[in-house]
A protein has these predicted regions:
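Extended hydrophobic/aromatic segments used for targeting, binding, or gating
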Residues: 121-167, 171
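Asp-based, Mg2+/Mn2+-dependent phosphohydrolase catalytic module
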Residues: 1-4, 149-225
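Short catalytic/ligand-binding loop motif for oxyanion handling, primarily in non-cytosolic enzymes
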Residues: 15-19, 130-133, 190, 208-209
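Substrate-recognition element of Asp-dependent hydrolases with the DxDx(T/V) motif
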Residues: 87, 96-139
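Asp-based phosphoryl-transfer active-site loop
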Residues: 2-23
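Conserved phosphoryl-transfer catalytic core
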Residues: 18-71
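Metal-dependent phosphoesterase signature
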Residues: 57-105
Length: 225
């Protein structure tokens, strides 16, 4: 591998159990979404989310928007206004102590070591930037946000699109060939590699195909940076 100046991390299946969102975060948001909208509808941030959701979903009243959002959640669709609203709901949960994020035991030591060597660390996830900050700010290993230089979500583009990785490289001001991307999803790694990034396939909760085209690790202490 070439030297790296930045490491970009996926969340689910990479730093965090792949089912953390589906078994903990999504049910928490789904149960609370209707009441959250009713209680906070007058707040500018929630009003803007509802306006965006109406445009995306093609519906025009709050009740229909809530139904559409629940439908998006059931289908695990990466719709930006839904992700933003989920983040607000999770924020309440983390602040109240209802939620604590899972990270694998090898993650925090590796992040601290890389950060200590001057490597910049970023998160790229389909979850909103707010949700990402909450996940890493309230982990079983403590607050990891001081180690992170920035966050990217679907507003920069979807994770299987080459252009997303080019935009991230431009945004952080690092040459693509000196950026390392860690993910458990081959299609994301393929897109990052096509953008000129270095890639490592993190194999934790599911096995890659036999024709894996990327270097593989099972733990972060195996990452050669």
């Amino acid at each position: 591998m070439l030297p790296v100046d930045a490491v970009v991390l996926d969340i689910e299946g990479t730093t965090t159990a792949i089912d953390f969102a589906t078994s903990v975060l999504y049910p928490y948001a789904r149960e609370r979404l209707p009441n959250f909208v009713r209680e906070h509808r007058g707040e500018p941030e929630v009003a803007a989310i509802m306006d965006e959701a109406r445009e995306v979903g093609g519906v025009w009243n709050d009740e229909a928007v809530v139904v559409r959002m629940c439908h998006w959640m059931e289908r695990d669709q990466k719709v930006t206004p839904l992700k933003t609203l989920q983040g607000l709901i999770w924020e309440e949960g983390y602040r109240s102590g209802d939620l604590v994020s899972h990270v694998y035991p090898d993650v925090a030591p590796a992040l601290r070591a890389w950060h200590g060597r001057g490597i910049r660390l970023y998160i790229y996830s389909s979850g909103s930037v707010l949700a990402q900050r909450l996940i890493y700010g309230h982990t079983v290993a403590g607050d990891l946000t001081p180690l992170l230089s920035g966050y990217f979500d679907t507003r920069v583009g979807h994770k299987r699109e080459v252009g997303s990785y080019r935009r991230i490289a431009e945004a952080i001001g690092v040459s693509p060939r000196r950026i390392l991307f860690l993910s458990d999803v081959r299609e994301e790694l393929d897109a990052a590699r096509e953008a000129g990034w270095q890639t490592i396939w993190v194999v934790r909760d599911r096995l890659p195909g036999l024709a894996a085209a990327h270097r593989r690790v099972t733990r972060f202490d195996q990452v050669p940076v």
